[in-house]
Amino acid sequence: MKHLLSIALAAIALVATPAMAQTAPSTFTGPRIGATVGFSNDKFIGTQAFTYGAEAGYDVAVGGAVLGVTAEILDNRDITRELALTARAGVRVGSKGLFYVTGGYSNIRTYGVTFDGVRLGVGGELALGKNAYVKLEQRYGNYQYGAHLWQSVIGAGVRF
């Protein structure tokens, strides 16, 4: 899954790299909601599982960059709930692509125990028309008591 994500992100980056200096259009600005599905690899309990969730966010264009915030809730078989509040900063790739880094607070609950931590990630987003988008993201979470969580997710959503 990590290799698939790396290949997909590289393909997005190669689509139109010369256009990265352009000013970001309204395609990557405003409120958005979406859903994610993917794979989690928990390095604390030692489990691997399908994960799914929902997110809401807001992005603004600042010159050729895109800055935003995202609130997310996820679930899987062993991690019964993950909440995350993250910021992201990205650059346009061509007219429809966005490459970004993300980071922020995350809280997971597993087997009745709650862990606070930090989530870092890298991702790519592709606009589908004016309002719809798809995305790929690779994430790493570092939590209390030595808990670590890797996630590879894909998502889709709409902007308003």
What are these regions (language model features)?
Residues 20-160:
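Gram-negative outer-membrane beta-barrel domains
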Residues 1-29:
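Cleavable N-terminal export/targeting peptides
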